């Protein structure tokens, strides 16, 4: 009988915290399947989900405000362990008969909590032991309200001078609350705390591993598709590449990929995609050379949003044209991943969680009467990368920096022309090459060159040159919501600038973008 890698599962209820997806990722890293659902998930759905344990996440609300979110009653009726984090602890306390009050002294940022009680959750986990034998943890706090009275049968788990009940526990029922955030890296022992809850207290086995996920996905694809043929739009990005590798392993020649070369890709990227999938892996790939069509459609357009729409529409036209030549296609594969499935804006209200529609190939599913195959829809990006490696994709492909869907079309400011794209491709290639040589590529989260349609005077030998300006952009980020410009060494910047100006005819000046996000965005358009 096949292994059920979803059998041991944790339910995470979202009350609107910016950290909620991080909790899910941490639980998955432990090797346990979990799902994220809105706090108002109905009781029947919770029972049907049948979790081994439940985590109540944080949120921006105050429990003593009217209509503030509450955990469903089923959470406390299932007789499974429950961990409340921040707001989750507060609503647990309030709903079970305790008391929560606003605090004059809010705690945001690093804090040290003293471990007070002898609980299963924190037993043997500490960062410090003081002279009196008191155990301490370095944690990350982000709260205004605090629990001032615990429900019956609870004991104090942890304490700070301004928050005497910074944690509470009832070992008999397996109920725990912590006012700090174990899911963020600033809480040094956070991984151990979550592992203790998920594995030791909830009894979950680590079945959620890369090799098991691949086997499970292959079995599901085969069961869904049978002997039918599947179409995939292959971009060369991480998600579509992993889908291609996974489907090829699952169904072989039943998969046909269409790779649209729009003339806005990185240097040699089209050839690399074809070499990897068609030549090395034997995947059926149709390459549609549509550079002229894209550039013709973009001619004269300088508005960034309109450029994006033109590129999107042209992609659909080209993809449709290629797909219509194929026979007996019944399924369309897409690289939808789990964060796409979770409605991001819904985290604020907690009630707007809907499944996004992902017709990233336009109206094709309806027009061609195709059914969708989305083998990555349960996975976070870091999990997609891990299974990419498991499937034999090269590390450099799987851990490549993000590249926007419209490609160089949004890295050329203003109107897109072939001349600009050719110059930018070469400049970007030099920048990335030098980052790799200096061991800076994987220290940055994203790095690229921007073409500016501005000319500047330069001197070459005894002659004057009037040529284009480009900007280097490199950032460091964890989540791409905020980003810091990368503090690259001056010597590296000097090398990159020198090579670009000397090796590329048409560039006279190289600048470096030192804007962080916010206020600037990572991409320029």
Curated annotation (Swiss-Prot):
**A molecular-function term among this protein's GO annotations:** GMP synthase activity
- Enzyme class, one word? ligase
User: Which named protein is this?
Assistant: GMP synthase [glutamine-hydrolyzing]
Q: What does this protein do?
A: Catalyzes the synthesis of GMP from XMP.
Q: How does it assemble?
A: Homodimer.
The record's EC number reads 6.3.5.2
The record's section on SUPFAM superfamilies has: Adenine nucleotide alpha hydrolases-like, Class I glutamine amidotransferase-like, GMP synthetase C-terminal dimerisation domain
């Amino acid at each position: 009988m096949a292994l059920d890698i979803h059998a041991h599962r944790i339910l995470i209820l979202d009350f609107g915290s910016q950290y909620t997806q991080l909790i899910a990722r941490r639980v998955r890293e432990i090797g346990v399947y979990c799902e994220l659902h809105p706090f108002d998930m109905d009781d029947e759905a919770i029972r049907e989900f049948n979790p081994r344990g439940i985590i109540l996440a944080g949120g921006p609300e105050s429990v003593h405000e009217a209509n503030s979110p509450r955990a469903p009653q089923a959470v406390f009726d299932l007789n499974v362990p429950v961990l409340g984090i921040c707001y989750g602890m507060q609503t647990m306390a309030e709903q079970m008969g305790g008391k929560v009050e606003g605090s004059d002294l809010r705690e945001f940022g690093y804090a040290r909590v003293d471990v007070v009680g002898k609980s299963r959750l924190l037993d043997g986990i500490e960062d410090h032991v003081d002279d009196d034998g008191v155990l301490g943890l370095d944690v990350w706090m982000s709260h205004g309200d605090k629990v001032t009275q615990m429900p019956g049968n609870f004991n104090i788990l942890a304490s700070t001078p301004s928050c005497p009940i910074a944690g509470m526990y009832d070992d008999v029922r397996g109920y725990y609350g912590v006012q700090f955030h174990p899911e963020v890296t600033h809480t040094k022992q956070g991984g151990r705390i979550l592992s203790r809850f998920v594995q030791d207290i909830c009894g979950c086995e680590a079945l959620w591993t890369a090799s098991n996920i691949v086997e499970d996905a292959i079995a599901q694809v085969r069961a869904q598709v049978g002997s039918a043929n599947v179409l995939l739009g292959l971009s060369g990005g991480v998600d579509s590449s992993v889908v291609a590798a996974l489907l090829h392993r699952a169904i072989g020649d039943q998969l046909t990929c269409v790779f649209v070369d729009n003339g806005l890709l990185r240097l040699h990227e089209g050839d690399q995609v074809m070499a990897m999938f068609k030549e090395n892996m034997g995947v059926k790939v149709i390459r549609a050379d549509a550079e002229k069509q894209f550039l013709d459609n973009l001619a004269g357009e300088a508005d960034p949003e309109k450029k994006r729409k033109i590129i999107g529409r042209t992609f659909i036209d080209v993809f449709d044209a290629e797909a219509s030549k194929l026979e007996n296609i019944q399924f369309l594969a897409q690289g939808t991943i789990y964060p796409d499935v979770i409605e991001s804006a819904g985290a604020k209200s907690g009630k707007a969680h809907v499944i996004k529609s992902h017709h990233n190939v336009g109206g094709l599913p309806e027009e061609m009467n195709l059914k969708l195959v989305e083998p990555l829809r349960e996975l976070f990006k870091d999990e997609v990368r891990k299974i990419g490696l498991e499937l034999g994709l090269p590390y450099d492909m799987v851990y490549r920096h993000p590249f926007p869907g419209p490609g160089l079309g949004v890295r050329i400011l203003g109107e897109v022309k072939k001349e600009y794209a050719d110059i930018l491709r070469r400049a970007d290639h030099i920048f990335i090459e030098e980052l790799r040589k200096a061991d800076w590529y994987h220290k940055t989260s994203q790095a690229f060159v921007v073409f500016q349609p501005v000319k500047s005077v330069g001197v070459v030998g005894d002659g004057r040159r009037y040529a284009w300006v480009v900007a280097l952009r490199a950032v460091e980020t964890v989540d791409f919501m905020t980003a810091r410009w990368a503090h690259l060494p001056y010597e590296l910047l000097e090398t990159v600038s020198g090579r670009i100006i000397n090796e590329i005819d048409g560039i006279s000046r190289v600048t470096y973008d030192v804007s962080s996000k916010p206020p600037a965005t990572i991409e320029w358009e």
